[in-house]
Every structure is written in structure tokens, then in C-alpha cells.
Curated annotation (Swiss-Prot):
It comes from Mus musculus. The record marks R81, S82 as: Cleavage. Residues 1-20 form the signal peptide. Disulfide bonds join C86-C101, C93-C107, C100-C118, C104-C128, C109-C116. This is Agouti-related protein. InterPro entries: Agouti, Agouti_dom, Agouti_dom_sf. Residues 21-81 form a propeptide. It is found in: Secreted; Golgi apparatus lumen. The gene is Agrp. Interacts with melanocortin receptors MC3R, MC4R and MC5R. Expressed in arcuate nucleus and median eminence, adrenal gland (medulla), hypothalamus, testis, and lung. One of its GO terms (molecular function) is type 4 melanocortin receptor binding. The lineage of its organism: Eukaryota, Metazoa, Chordata, Craniata, Vertebrata.
Amino acid sequence: MLTAMLLSCVLLLALPPTLGVQMGVAPLKGIRRPDQALFPEFPGLSLNGLKKTTADRAEEVLLQKAEALAEVLDPQNRESRSPRRCVRLHESCLGQQVPCCDPCATCYCRFFNAFCYCRKLGTATNLCSRT
């Protein structure tokens, strides 16, 4: 039993050198710069391509997106809008992002915001209620 255990320990200690695993400081002697440490056996590979930070890459992506948006949102090539960009009094303003045509009117909603229309609201603090 003891001989089997000693034999297995010797084999485990002798296995890494036979497989070519280099242990110790010897492989690190030829490394002078950090970019040589990645793959010293391949001189073409280095960390130069990996040195870009994520902030630089994110900035490049944002610049590309901004250029693409500038091309899409060119004001000369934009389609003409409809002439009416407001909601008249007593017309539905439900789900619309345009204001009421009358500056004294607001979008008034009833029945749990299911029915909305432009309406003049008269209050004492509202300057439009006097007219």
C-alpha cells in the first residue's frame, strides 16, 4: 500500500515536466514589456489592439450613431408637417401630444381618463376666465 502511494506521488510530481509545462521564472526572463507577455511565441500578437478602453469604444459607437442620426434628421429632406398642430375646443385630445389651439384651454379628462377633450376651465386664479 505504501509503495503504491509513493509511486503515485512520484508520477504526479514527474508528470508536469514530461508534458512540457514550464514552471518557475525561466519563461519570464525574455519579457521586457507588458505587451510581450500575451503570447511570446507569436511575435505578431500584442496588447496594442486590446489597449483601447471601453470608454473609447463607447465614444466611437456614440459618434457613429450621431452621424447616422444626422443623416436621417436632415432638415432639408424632412417631410412637410400637417398645418394644424393643435386640438380645437371640444375635440378629443386623448393620447395626443399636441396642445389645444386656444391658449386658455386645457385637455380635460373625465371617467378615469377615458374621455378627454379641450375645454376652457374658469377659475379665479386663471387669467383666461375673465374673458
